[in-house]
């Protein structure tokens, strides 16, 4: 389970409540079938990895891994076995006799994860553990932590993992299920696929995905029995499926939502459902371009493969182009509740 959201949404506070580091104001905290409200952190069967991993500088990697087990008075042979097992999983075998100052950032973070593994907890709690690493190391560690979770499952000693991050890439690539939070409230708990394709509200729709979803105010207008989106001074008819989902909402203020990859752009009008805008700027991502169109009083982002975009871009900016939406991928949100009324 990954908890994701912007800074200040209470995701780390939620994790600390699970760990027993933060007092809850009401309700129950359960780990498995056990209510743990009144249990100290060490009695909850959890292991936590923080953003600042704080290894003991005067101890070797081996000693850092073993320290918590020694405090619990575990037999020496068992400590050695569990340290060696964790070192093997995280590929730390060659580093066991090094001091923290002799480690790279990624290696030090693996040791911090190893200290959690050796405890063999019921629950792993990760609080933004990769925030201090550069982009390349973050990608590598994401894979390692995901692989660790799978290995523990296969070993017959599975542990629930709760992972907190503000990075949606980490959330989408690591989570079996993701909890999206805003200002202390849960906005949606779902699979990565459902969060992306079936967001329950405008916040989730705009938070998940990069570049973010185009979400703009619109009116649903009736055109000879078929509803259409009002876009500037033009309209774009809904698909039959979308029409059936939102029929009856014509009188409401609404927003449409469309991801940039479901916006098509052309120099010529499309056969059906075409609107126009001004091509104002582009961003070259190598294999694709982000094309920004000025439509009425806002910008619309389109994500277009390079071979399609290049001929249009070569004709220059600040000129009229045409666009249409894949209406089977379009969302309609109620302006008052911000809920998705099209799923």
Predicted regions and their residues:
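The feature captures the beta-strand-to-loop junction immediately N-terminal to the Walker
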Residues: 4-6
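ABC ATPase nucleotide-binding domain helices that frame the ATP-binding cleft
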Residues: 12-15, 111
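Helix-to-loop junction immediately C-terminal to a conserved catalytic motif
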Residues: 19
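Conserved coupling/switch loops of ABC nucleotide-binding domains, chiefly the family-specific signature
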Residues: 25-28, 78, 183, 330
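Conserved ABC transporter NBD signature motif
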Residues: 27-35
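ABC ATPase nucleotide-binding domains
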Residues: 44-45, 55-203
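Non-catalytic connector elements of ABC transporters
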Residues: 213, 223-343
